[in-house]
């Protein structure tokens, strides 16, 4: 798949990031992960991102990363494109990017570098180095310490033909408008805030109709229903699901730092597709929080 073909795929439809399955000992469970992907693939996501933020990229070992990507690519071959999360220090990100390309990933999501503060020029050099190390398409994730300006994104777009996507995890409307205006059709634009459904209608009005859905992991039918309602400007359906599900979900998610991932793993457990616990430093939901989530999910009906 060429970078431009990837850009075309990412320019429409719903995206998602499967959780990564761990066994009781906390090790990667390839068989359970494959079953998860087999279950999710038919629901109609345009692409799935293996080892993304919701997939606990930040806690994955370099030894298990290739197994995760290979399992995803092999399981979804011919059904849905797999993009791989990459990140960390520049050399590590390059190593992961090349491994993912070798294993058949159709593209990469370049997650923010870890902790280290860096200048705009330093972050741009990091992004460029990863892009130049592979031929497949790359999506850069503007979030946390990775805050590229429209001017630098434009320079990167000129120097890196395979940089084809921009994912926004900052939620700064002025910046998003500026990036969209300056780069035009050069990129595919993805909404990437946690529980992106809450912001979906607003981002669509900015010219960003595509977003990644974490809840697709455990309520894929409802996630697709919501996406289609936003696309069709069906404000009745959007409002109903926001009020009945997403806002109550946020009340649970916002109780503790890290729950944006923990609540997804709890959700898949509720529906009978348990992926095991989250890895430290994240913590699982407390029992009362889990029961509140389960009640919300049950109200939505079969998925």
Swiss-Prot record:
Its EC number is 4.2.1.41. Pfam families: DHDPS. InterPro entries: Aldolase_TIM, DapA-like, Dehydro-deoxyglucarate_dehyd. It catalyses: 5-dehydro-4-deoxy-D-glucarate + H(+) = 2,5-dioxopentanoate + CO2 + H2O. Keywords: Lyase. It comes from the Bacteria. SMART domains: DHDPS (SM01130). GO terms for biological process: D-glucarate catabolic process. The keyword Lyase applies. Pathway: Carbohydrate acid metabolism; D-glucarate degradation; 2,5-dioxopentanoate from D-glucarate: step 2/2. GO terms for molecular function: 4-hydroxy-tetrahydrodipicolinate synthase activity; 5-dehydro-4-deoxyglucarate dehydratase activity. It is an enzyme of class 4 (lyase). Belongs to the DapA family. HAMAP family: KDGDH. This is Probable 5-dehydro-4-deoxyglucarate dehydratase. It comes from Azotobacter vinelandii (strain DJ / ATCC BAA-1303).
């Amino acid at each position: 798949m060429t970078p431009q073909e990837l850009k075309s795929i990412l320019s429409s439809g719903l995206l998602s990031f499967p959780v990564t399955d761990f066994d009781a000992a906390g090790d990667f469970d390839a068989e359970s992960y494959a079953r998860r992907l087999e279950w999710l693939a038919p629901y109609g996501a345009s692409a799935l991102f293996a080892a993304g933020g919701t997939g606990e990229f930040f806690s994955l070992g370099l030894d298990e990363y290739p197994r995760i990507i290979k399992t995803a690519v092999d399981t979804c071959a011919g059904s849905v494109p797999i993009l791989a999360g990459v990140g960390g220090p520049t050399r590590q990100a390059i190593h992961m990017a090349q491994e993912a390309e070798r294993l058949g990933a159709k593209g990469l999501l370049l997650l923010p570098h870890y902790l280290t503060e860096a200048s705009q020029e330093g972050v741009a050099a990091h992004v460029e180095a990863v892009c130049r190390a592979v031929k497949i398409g790359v999506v850069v994730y503007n979030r946390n310490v990775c805050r590229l300006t429209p001017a630098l994104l434009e320079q990167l777009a000129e120097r890196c033909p395979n940089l084809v996507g921009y994912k926004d995890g900052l939620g700064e409307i002025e910046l998003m408008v500026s990036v969209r205006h300056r780069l035009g059709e050069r990129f595919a634009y993805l909404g990437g805030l946690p529980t992106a459904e809450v912001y979906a209608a607003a981002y669509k009005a900015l010219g960003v109709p595509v977003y990644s859905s974490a809840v697709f992991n455990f309520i894929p039918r409802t996630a697709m229903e919501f996406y289609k309602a936003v696309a069709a400007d069906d404000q009745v359906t959007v409002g109903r699901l926001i009020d009945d599900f997403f806002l109550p979900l946020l009340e649970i998610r916002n109780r503790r730092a890290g729950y944006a991932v923990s609540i997804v793993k709890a959700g898949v457990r509720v529906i009978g597709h348990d992926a095991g616990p989250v890895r430290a430093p994240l913590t699982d939901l407390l029992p009362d929080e889990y029961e509140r989530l389960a009640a919300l999910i049950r109200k939505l009906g079969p998925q």
